[in-house]
């Protein structure tokens, strides 16, 4: 506080109980007097309502790292790339930004508390470059609060921010289930046994208008055996107990079934071409690569051949490689040149394998199907607050 003498006095009317409460609060915060506390409150309030001068960004050049017939890998900051990009010139932004993990990793995670503030400049850029009928797809993993078996809400706060502040529409939330994911977090899953394993990422499919161009006919899954039998033997139209009317059209062969928004895609590329390429050259392996089938799904469903796909957090350039294989123009921007050096493996030798060339299905068993005697397995009464004794 200022050491200058205070020549002006003022009266503040409050009850005895209110005065006592305020004085107690001021004392607990270390203020020597009630006056000092009230002046500090006023200064804080004035600072909160004062406009903050936002310094304009100085656009820096991004360097062209590698170019193909259809796309380019860029080394630099994607904010700079978007600053110089023509407005409404991108059909799909497909990306997996650094997750706001509580335990920061080597690839540049922001503290989850500040994640939305960190993301805002990117949201501005996305809104600028995306076409009105385009899509923004964000694969984003969850985070655990440090020291507790409870979840951060940062990825939901990000979704709300993009919709409420920037006017994006949630076309449909998707959930990427990785059947090969290890039981994590180990402390709560394997040690204290108070949570099931976290094996799903949220994937937000957003758009500038409620009606982005799309077709689910582009991403059909094979029919199940029961549906194949129904198509072969016919189906009698009827009303189900739920009240839904199943018409004769239900028995029409449409070439495949419409997939759900639960995407079962194993991420099992631990010993693939990309890793071998990086290991032989002593390069950093990007720690958060999504499988090629994930961008393939959205690229097929929301873009046409010749459209433009952009990944602002390019990493090992999976999005670019899939876009190239599907005949889309593309750009991937990555700040770490070592990751781009490893990404070269995706454009040398054999092209990336698409989903149609490696069809697969996964079985997930019904929870509670394994026989367990409840009397022999007591609940963890303290909710996992203490580690079990060995």
Pin down the residues of each PLM region.
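Short, flexible loop/turn segments with low-complexity composition
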Residues: 53-57, 217-222, 353-364
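Short Lys/Arg-rich basic patches
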Residues: 1-27
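C-terminal helical cap(s) of enzyme catalytic domains, especially alpha/beta-barrels
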Residues: 340, 344-354
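Conserved SAM/SAH-binding loop
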Residues: 75-80, 360-369
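Short, basic amphipathic alpha-helical segments that act as recognition/interaction helices
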Residues: 21, 28-54
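A generic structural micro-feature
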Residues: 4-6, 38, 194-198
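Core catalytic lobe of class I
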Residues: 58-342, 379-390
């Amino acid at each position: 506080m200022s050491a200058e003498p205070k020549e002006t006095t003022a009266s503040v009317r409050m009850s005895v109980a209110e005065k006592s409460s305020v004085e107690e609060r001021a004392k607990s915060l270390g203020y020597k007097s009630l006056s000092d506390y009230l002046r500090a409150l006023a200064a804080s309030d004035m600072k909160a309502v004062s406009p903050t001068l936002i310094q304009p960004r100085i656009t820096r050049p991004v360097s062209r790292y590698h170019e193909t017939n259809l796309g380019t890998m860029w080394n630099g900051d994607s904010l700079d790339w978007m600053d110089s990009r023509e407005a409404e010139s991108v059909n799909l932004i497909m990306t997996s930004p650094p997750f706001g993990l509580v335990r920061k990793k080597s690839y540049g995670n922001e503290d989850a508390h500040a994640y939305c503030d960190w993301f805002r400049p990117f949201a501005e850029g996305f809104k600028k470059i995306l076409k009105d009928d385009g899509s923004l797809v964000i694969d984003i993993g969850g985070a655990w609060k440090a020291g507790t078996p409870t979840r951060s809400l940062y990825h939901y706060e990000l979704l709300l921010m993009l919709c409420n502040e920037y006017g994006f529409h949630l076309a449909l939330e998707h959930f990427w289930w990785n059947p090969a994911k290890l039981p994590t977090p180990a402390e709560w899953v394997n040690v204290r046994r108070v949570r099931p394993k976290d094996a799903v990422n949220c994937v937000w499919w957003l758009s500038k208008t409620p009606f982005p161009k799309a077709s689910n006919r582009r991403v059909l899954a094979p029919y199940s055996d029961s549906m194949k039998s129904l198509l072969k033997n016919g189906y009698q139209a009827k009303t189900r107990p739920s009240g839904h009317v199943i018409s004769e059209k239900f028995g029409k062969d449409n070439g495949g079934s419409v997939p759900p928004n639960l995407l079962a895609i194993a991420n099992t590329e631990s010993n693939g071409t990309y890793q071998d390429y990086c290991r032989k050259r002593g390069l950093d392996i990007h720690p958060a690569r999504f499988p090629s089938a994930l961008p393939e799904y959205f690229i097929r469903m929301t873009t046409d051949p010749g459209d433009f796909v952009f990944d602002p957090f390019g990493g090992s350039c999976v999005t670019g490689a899939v876009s190239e294989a599907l005949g889309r123009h593309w750009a991937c921007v990555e700040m770490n040149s070592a990751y781009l050096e490893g990404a070269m493996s995706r454009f040398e030798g054999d092209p990336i394998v698409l989903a149609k060339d490696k069809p697969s299905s996964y079985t997930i068993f019904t929870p509670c199907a394994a026989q367990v005697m409840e009397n022999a397995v007591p609940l963890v009464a303290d909710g996992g607050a203490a580690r079990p004794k060995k």
